Amino acid sequence: MDIPTPSRTFDITVDGEEKTITMSYGLFNEIMRVIPSPELIASLIVTDADLRDYVIRRMLTGNKKVTTDADLVDPFDLDIDMDRVDELVAWVAEHVLHFFMKSAAKTAKIGEKYQGTVEELTRLSQSQTGAEN
């Protein structure tokens, strides 16, 4: 399965200035902490206002360490086009889904590669513990 990689950067105008957001390792990890499963992507986009707000504010804060909510940009101080905000959320969702899909594909390949070995180890461990073969 060939899954295209999302763009590493996203351009958005904030307060009249062009800003480029780069999906760095640290930024991606912070997003993954609040979106632990692909099923939550729908919540991010549609139903969970708090999750959506955090993701937007975190992205607009940039690649710096955030330890408290006060470290995030204040949404009331932002002059930003809402359509671009929706596109930003979709860009983040694309990165998260890409990660889960690529990880699942890699894990499936590893499972196929070692299936016989795992079955043999399972059989051996059962026979050593007295379980029937």
Segments from the language model and where they lie:
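Short, surface-exposed, charged amphipathic helix/loop patches that serve as local interaction elements
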Residues: 2-7, 25-133
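Short, isolated positions in well-ordered beta-strands
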Residues: 19-21
